[in-house]
Swiss-Prot record:
Sorting receptor that directs prohormones to the regulated secretory pathway. Also acts as a prohormone processing enzyme in neuro/endocrine cells, removing dibasic residues from the C-terminal end of peptide hormone precursors after initial endoprotease cleavage. The keyword Isomerase does not apply. Disulfide bonds: none annotated. Glycans are attached at residues 139, 390. Residues 1-27 form the signal peptide. The gene is Cpe. It comes from Mus musculus (Mouse). This is Carboxypeptidase E.
């Protein structure tokens, strides 16, 4: 993954150096703006942010520009390719890019899953530019975030669909053309339907998390999954993400799990075990967006049913049922909590409105990112201080566990309250601790687990000591 991303980066950088900022011929696609148009874009920036639509070559150029400006805290990599061969590019921002630092949580933003929903794509490009600019200015909030969080930003999960939508004239950009990938697959209905599995497990007993454990090969062999879907599944499996948001368009609301209803009906509040923290996470986004959180905002369209919306948030199933969505897949296949944010009534609004969308969402994007530092965090180790990977962290009263990463580090998002946490692992004695969780920051709770073999040896030594004492006392 990283090697291929490195080769792409070297090629892009060579082209940038040779041509000032132009891309290679490989990046010039049919329908892409001419060089003169790209130069116009370079001139139309405000505080380092270009409030214009970025076609695929320009998206690559924008990410490379951020990397060239902030090489010490960023890197570009790809998680795979779209059906038509475009790279699914990610820019990472961290004080140690490319490395998972033990104890540091991992965050991701994904945009443009539906190719014709363009605002999220642009906001994530703007966000990368903003984080780089503000870090260099010494903005304390941004510096602290980048030093304490590994941030991954994927502006476009569906670059093929976006190119198709962007090539349409006028209003045809908006509602239909380019929504699906180049195969005609709706990516947000294409993930393994883990909701149906967990709903059965709720009734009959069974796992409540990591429902795709050790099934990567099956994912690769599933011909019904789009290449974009497979790439993201591997990404989710490979990196210990804690928090995520998937940016869409077509309405104004922050949507939280579950997306698919339990009964199969079209509309039904479908709470997940972490309903309390998910409501709080959704509000952390919506409350900083003045339009999204406005209780008097009229529906985007006359016949829209926004009755499930509360403070700019909604439970997914209460709004409308979505089987096979990426949001619930994150929650049920990994440790990652994800919400879906609808950013705009129009899916592909006029270019001149992009600046106002950025102004409405900038604080929300930062606020949501900060939520990763809530709940409980820590390490699970053995008595010798060695990390225990894949240890289970259970919360009494919440039927959804998380697991420790390879360094024994774990993160458990929780709403404020008093909890009992239990750490367990095969071959070890479980330990339970009580913890009072504030709104923020995350409380550190470490666990040291004793192995069964160590306990047996300890019991043997205690027995020998007892026998020695009895022998000395009774003189035999």
């Amino acid at each position: 993954m990283a090697g291929r991303g490195g080769r792409v980066l070297l090629a892009l950088c060579a082209a940038l150096v040779a041509g000032g900022w132009l891309l290679t011929a490989e990046a010039q696609e049919p329908g892409a703006p001419a060089a003169g148009m790209r130069r116009r874009r370079r001139l139309q920036q405000e505080d380092g942010i270009s409030f214009e639509y970025h076609r695929y070559p320009e998206l690559r150029e924008a990410l490379v520009s951020v990397w060239l400006q902030c090489t010490a805290i960023s890197r570009i990599y790809t998680v795979g390719r779209s059906f038509e061969g475009r790279e699914l590019l990610v820019i990472e921002l961290s004080d140690n890019p490319g490395v998972h630092e033990p104890g540091e949580p991992e965050f991701k933003y994904i945009g443009n899953m539906h190719g014709n929903e363009a605002v999220g794509r642009e906001l994530l490009i703007f966000l990368a530019q903003y984080l780089c600019n503000e870090y260099q200015k010494g903005n304390e909030t941004i510096v602290n975030l980048i030093h304490s969080t590994r941030i991954h930003i994927m502006p476009s999960l569906n670059p093929d669909g976006f190119e198709k939508a962007a090539s349409q004239p006028g209003e045809l950009k908006d509602w239909f053309v380019g929504r699906s990938n180049a195969q005609g697959i709706d990516l947000n209905r294409n993930f393994p339907d883990l909701d149906r599995i967990v709903y059965v497990n709720e009734k009959e007993g069974g796992p409540n998390n990591h429902l795709l454990k050790n099934l990567k090969k099956i994912v690769d062999q599933n011909s019904k999954l789009a290449p974009e879907t497979k790439a993201v599944i591997h990404w989710i499996m490979d990196i210990p993400f804690v928090l995520s948001a998937n940016l869409h368009g077509g309405d104004l609301v922050a949507n939280y799990p579950y997306d698919e209803t339990r009964s199969g009906t079209a509309h039904e509040y479908s709470s997940c075990p972490d309903d309390a923290i998910f409501q709080s996470l959704a509000r952390a986004y919506s409350s900083f967006n003045p339009v999204m959180s406005d209780p008097n905002r009229p529906p985007c369209r006359k016949n829209d049913d926004d009755s499930s919306f509360v403070d700019g948030t909604t439970n997914g199933g209460a709004w409308y049922s979505v089987p096979g969505g990426m949001q619930d897949f994150n929650y049920l296949s990994s440790n990652c909590f994800e919400i879906t944010v609808e950013l705009s009534c129009e899916k592909f609004p006029p270019e001149e409105t992009l600046k106002s969308y950025w102004e409405d969402n900038k604080n929300s994007l930062i606020s949501y990112l900060e939520q990763i530092h809530r709940g409980v965090k820590g390490f699970v180790r053995d008595l010798q201080g060695n990390p225990i990977a894949n240890a289970t962290i259970s919360v009494d009263g919440i039927d959804h566990d998380v697991t420790s990463a390879k360094d024994g580090d774990y993160w458990r998002l929780l709403a404020p309250g008093n909890y009992k946490l239990t750490a367990s692992a095969p071959g070890y004695l479980a330990i339970t601790k009580k913890v009072a969780v504030p709104f923020s920051p995350a409380v550190g709770v470490d666990f040291e687990l004793e192995s069964f073999s160590e306990r047996k040896e300890e019991e043997k030594e205690e027995l020998m000591e007892w026998w020695k004492m009895m022998s000395e006392t009774l003189n035999f």
